[in-house]
């Protein structure tokens, strides 16, 4: 076991590539002339969610035959969607709150309908707690397309996607290798970080019809795309999913949002052996002396490339990751050792805290070695400090469980000297939380469940929520306001529309604000504002633990801050694929019902209702209905 001395500065930052704080009005393919606006290809909201309260009004699950949580879930799908063809997705697990999470994928003629899912949440009592459903119910294709093979070949699909989205991928001289009956890999291409693939699948369209498509996967760095090209017409792209959502350690310790909030400290062995039993500097096979271990691998990436294994990373004698840094140092490369160390530290603390709250191996977390605890390994987070592929941003790519996540932290040029995103914890926590939400929502095997506009907005909001919750100080009250990204952006207003506040005069956002918003960061600000209200309601009821880790009593955090973080995380795993605000709210209420028997029902309802997501709120992508009503028992 490594004995380390850490110099720390508190960081509270948080593949699906998700970009961080940059205020913008559209989501485009990053950094290239002629980039296409991906909002035109977003997946539509199709999911329904049957909450615990609604389940009580339906025929009892007791009529189902007794069995395991998998058998109960399967029986529910059979009875709810009779005569439907589906398969069990191999990422089911029982979370640390005792809920069995089971997911099914609809199929047609043995071919997946890629956006048709059914998730079932089975409670500790063996009965269904809730479920989500986006199964396709329209007419089935008359014949199996594999019989006549009346569809374009995959190379045509790749070229069609390349042209339609203006991708920097070249396929001249490339050839196709079969991976399975419905999936191929393209060998000999250039312009992508890994070999593109194509999988034949159906897509349920917004108009209620079904399209046979090639799902073409291309990782081009700042975008990691799943593009659904029509299998009959090589110029028609139906939808696009982007996986990217743009020793001793001398660091800013956990809880410090940026260099303005405190000084750097030297920390010795800062890991938690309950959540990182191999420490941060080993993977069970190798003990490392650089910023590399089971949870993450951090390095300098000035050219923005993908060859991270051979990039520079600090490797000090005696494991003393102690390097000079001050915000006045310039150019940034002069303090790269401190930058990589800080990024490595903050991301590992994220891993450990989220593990305690339920994001473990079974739930699809990021680790090389899962030590036989479930899930798929070989997927630490690749952490690129001072990444040269961009500026004034950060992003995180979340592929399914078993493939490494990738975070890129950029230099911000809004100040002189420039500022390094590695030193703003809120940015790093926000990005890491994209990995959390994309693995939990839809299950570890499906990173495509936060791509509808409101769903993607919640992905941004969760990142801000965890970054803000970690940042709370001992003397903070519900009157305390916080901005997001103020330091890196060199702006007291930060990078969001409003500060996070419980004061309607400071932050007036409500649910119907979304009717005028069409960008995920803006919608995420509305969602985080609601969660901030819930957070303070729970803190006012249960108090606030200002320590770096939660204290549990019978599996429940004993304070309001960590309880809010736990309930929000549990809600991510309960909700359906591509949820809307109403469904995500109900999932948090169901998480509380499971964890505390609904002891916090009214605090949660009042927080949401204050911001227009009360009992009567209704989702319509073009005309949402707000409500300030709470259940009668909460009045």
UniProtKB/Swiss-Prot annotation:
Q: Which residues form the active site?
A: 431
| Cofactor field | Zn(2+)
The note on cofactor binding and number reads: Binds 1 zinc ion per subunit.
Question: What residues bear carbohydrate chains?
Answer: 287, 475, 594, 623
* Propeptide regions on this chain: 20-246
Concerning Gene3D superfamilies, the annotation shows: 3.10.170.10, Neutral Protease Domain 2
According to its UniProt entry, one GO biological process term is: proteolysis
Q: Name one GO molecular function term.
A: zinc ion binding
Protein residues bound to Zn(2+): 430, 434
The signal peptide here is 1-19
Which keywords does the record carry?
A: Glycoprotein, Hydrolase, Metal-binding, Metalloprotease, Protease, Secreted, Signal, Virulence, Zinc, Zymogen
- According to its UniProt record, the EC number is 3.4.24.-
Job of this protein: Secreted metalloproteinase probably acting as a virulence factor.
State what protein this is by name.
Extracellular metalloproteinase 1
Organism listed in the record: Arthroderma benhamiae (Trichophyton mentagrophytes)
Q: Which gene encodes it?
A: MEP1
């Amino acid at each position: 076991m490594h004995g380390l001395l850490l110099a720390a500065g508190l960081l509270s930052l948080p593949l699906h590539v998700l970009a961080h704080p940059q205020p913008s009005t559209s989501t485009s393919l990053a950094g290239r002339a002629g980039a296409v606006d991906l909002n035109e290809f977003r997946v539509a909201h199709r999911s329904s969610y049957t909450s615990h309260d609604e389940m009580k009004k339906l025929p009892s699950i007791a009529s189902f035959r007794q069995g395991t949580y998998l058998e109960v879930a399967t029986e529910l799908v059979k009875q709810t969607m009779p005569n439907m063809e589906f398969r069990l997705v191999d990422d089911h697990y029982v979370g640390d709150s005792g809920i069995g999470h089971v997911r099914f994928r609809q199929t047609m003629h043995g071919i997946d309908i890629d956006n048709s899912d059914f998730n079932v949440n089975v409670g500790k009592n063996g009965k269904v707690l809730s479920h989500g459903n986006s199964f396709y119910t329209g007419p089935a294709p008359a014949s199996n397309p594999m019989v006549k093979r009346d569809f374009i070949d995959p190379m045509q699909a790749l070229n069609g996607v390349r042209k339609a989205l203006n991708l920097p991928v070249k396929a001249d001289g490339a050839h196709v290798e079969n991976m399975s009956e419905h999936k191929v890999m393209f060998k000999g291409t250039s312009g992508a970080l890994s070999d593109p693939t194509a999988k034949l699948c159906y897509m349920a369209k917004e108009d209620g019809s079904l399209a046979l498509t090639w799902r073409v996967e291309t990782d081009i760095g700042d975008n990691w795309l799943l593009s659904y090209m029509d299998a009959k017409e090589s110029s028609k792209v139906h939808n696009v999913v982007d996986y990217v959502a743009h020793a001793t350690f001398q660091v800013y310790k956990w809880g410090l949002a940026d260099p303005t909030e405190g000084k750097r400290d030297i920390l010795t062995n800062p890991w938690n052996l309950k959540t990182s039993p191999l420490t941060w500097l080993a993977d069970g096979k190798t003990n490392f002396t650089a910023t590399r271990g089971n949870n993450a691998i951090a390095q300098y990436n000035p050219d923005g490339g993908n060859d991270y294994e051979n990039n520079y990373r600090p490797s000090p004698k005696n494991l003393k990751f102690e390097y000079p840094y001050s915000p006045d140092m310039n150019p940034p490369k002069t303090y790269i050792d401190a930058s990589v160390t800080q990024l490595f530290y903050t991301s590992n603390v994220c891993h450990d805290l989220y593990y305690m709250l339920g994001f473990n191996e079974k739930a699809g977390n990021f680790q090389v070695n899962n030590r036989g605890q479930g899930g798929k390994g070989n997927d630490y987070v690749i952490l690129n400090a001072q990444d040269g592929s961009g500026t004034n941003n950060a992003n995180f790519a979340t592929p399914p469980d078993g493939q490494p996540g990738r975070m890129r932290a950029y230099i911000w040029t809004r100040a002189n000297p420039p500022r390094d995103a590695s030193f703003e914890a809120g940015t790093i926590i926000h990005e890491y939380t994209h990995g959390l939400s994309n693995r939990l929502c839809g299950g570890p095997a499906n990173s495509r469940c936060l791509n509808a506009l409101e769903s993607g907005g919640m992905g941004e909001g969760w990142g801000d929520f965890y970054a803000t919750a970690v940042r709370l100080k001992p003397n903070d009250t519900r009157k305390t306001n916080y901005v997001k990204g103020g330091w890196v952006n060199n702006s007291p207003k930060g990078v969001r529309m409003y500060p996070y506040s419980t004061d309607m005069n400071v932050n007036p956002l409500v649910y119907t604000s979304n009717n005028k918003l069409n960008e995920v960061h803006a919608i995420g600000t509305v969602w985080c504002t609601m969660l901030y209200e819930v957070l303070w309601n729970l803190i006012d009821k249960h108090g606030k633990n200002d320590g770096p880790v939660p204290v549990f009593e019978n599996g429940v955090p004993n304070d309001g801050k960590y309880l809010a973080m736990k309930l929000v995380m549990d809600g991510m795993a309960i909700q359906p694929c591509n949820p809307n605000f109403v469904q995500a709210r109900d999932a948090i209420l169901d998480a509380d019902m499971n964890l505390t028997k609904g002891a916090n029902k009214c605090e949660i309802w009042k927080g949401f209702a204050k911001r227009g997501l009360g009992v009567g709120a209704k989702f319509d992508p073009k005309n949402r209905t707000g409500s300030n009503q709470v259940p009668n028992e909460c009045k």
